[in-house]
UniProtKB/Swiss-Prot annotation:
PANTHER family: MEMBRANE PROTEIN INSERTION EFFICIENCY FACTOR-RELATED. It is found in: Cell membrane. It holds the Pfam family YidD. This is Putative membrane protein insertion efficiency factor. InterPro entries: Membr_insert_effic_factor_YidD.
Amino acid sequence: MKRILIAPVRFYQRFISPVFPPSCRFELTCSNYMIQAIEKHGFKGVLMGLARILRCHPWSKTGKDPVPDHFSLKRNQEGE
């Protein structure tokens, strides 16, 4: 199941992302965050990844935002 959820993200990383300049505001890119969240939390990781994408905009804070060990849709402020 996790492999099926990760496949579209890998497709994006391989074929779509290289066409555009880097724009993620976080140290762990949003696509890598999504993959790690899915690996840790399964389907809930998709929700976490989508919430992360919504947080990634020009007016958000930058920096580290690792995948938390528990399910959360909020930014992991570890290290701040």
